[in-house]
Amino acid sequence: MGMITNDWLDAISGEFKKPYYRELYQFVREEYARTTVYPPADDIFNAFHFTPLSKVKVLLLGQDPYHNVNQAHGLSFSVLPEQREIPPSLQNIYKELHDDLGCYIPNNGYLKKWADQGVLLLNTVLTVRRSEEHTF
């Protein structure tokens, strides 16, 4: 699993030393070893990698990662560029942005540009088993 290396580390590093975190880390490692889990392990903390704490302007909180191939990559509501279908939850966000603010609706669901602009795209759960919603 990719480690956090920016200013988020100072803010949350104390959690990494606590017993619950060590147990959780071990559990997640075992899940990755025995089954398919999304996002890929190196992408789990992408929300923190792409949006440093000092750059956060707004939080867009999702529930859990998408659970199918070529979707989850560590940013809530975002899918990888090769995924041509925009998930319904993101379609709803795009529709609201268009209806309320007149924003352009992109033809893809890759939101890294939002993250780079200070939108923290974080799920309340960072990993999910393939094809199973709400698994852990």
What are these regions (language model features)?
Residues 2, 14-136:
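A polyanion-binding, active-site-adjacent surface
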